Amino acid sequence: SDIEANCPKIKVICSVSSSFVPDVLSAKATKYKDRIIVTHPFNPAHMVPFFELCGGDNTGEGVLQFAKEMLESLDRKPVILKKPAPGFIGNRLQFALWREALNLVESGICDPRDVDTCLNYSFCPRYTSIGMYEHFDNGDLRLNITTCNTVFPTLSNISEAPAAITDRIARGDTGARAESKKGFYDWNGVDMDAYRERVNAPYWRFINWDMPKE
């Protein structure tokens, strides 16, 4: 309502929600339902170029395209979803991987550090230069079908957070920001400034900027 009252000529109202679809966000709007969309970034948002744009049943013609062109003018890499889905693209992919990572550890197949080592030193670096569809297309789908038929039936299909998460939350071990500084890892004694530098380093290289000295 504040936007409606103070910005009568506004062309688009963008939410950065990672899960709410536009129709939920526009439900309380009285005037500009057709201009409300989601433009979801990934953190650190000032460095990561990707945005996922999503409209709803009320979204007006041309609104998504206007937002896409605006972001492209800022050297971002936006995509427009053909229809809403909880979690959009990025979080659906990320949490599908997270669900299986949790399953691997709970099943006794490996430890959390093993999962992270696999991600750091196997296929994740590849996907900064080519996409998943490109990768499997280039490898020949006739080979891919065997792996799909073998692995897919064994993957986790749980529909809620597992005990590995809920048990830790119950005892207060919610991660690096917890009073205990424990989650899956023990963060006591970890240099958090150095950790944050590791978080940001790939993006500095990706956009060809020099790492800051301070």
Kindly give the residue locations of the regions a language model identified.
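Oxidoreductase and adenylate-handling cofactor-binding alpha/beta cores
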Residues: 27, 96-103, 110-112
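Rossmann-fold dinucleotide-binding core
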Residues: 12-83, 87, 91
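Residues within well-ordered alpha helices
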Residues: 70, 103-104
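Short phosphate-engaging motifs
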Residues: 21, 97, 143
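Hydrophobic residues in alpha-helical segments
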Residues: 15, 54, 105-106, 169-170
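Rossmann-like NAD(P)-binding element
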Residues: 1-12
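NAD(P)-dependent Rossmann-like dehydrogenase/reductase catalytic/cofactor-binding core
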Residues: 65, 76-82, 107, 112-214
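A general alpha-helix detector
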Residues: 49-50, 97-101, 146-151
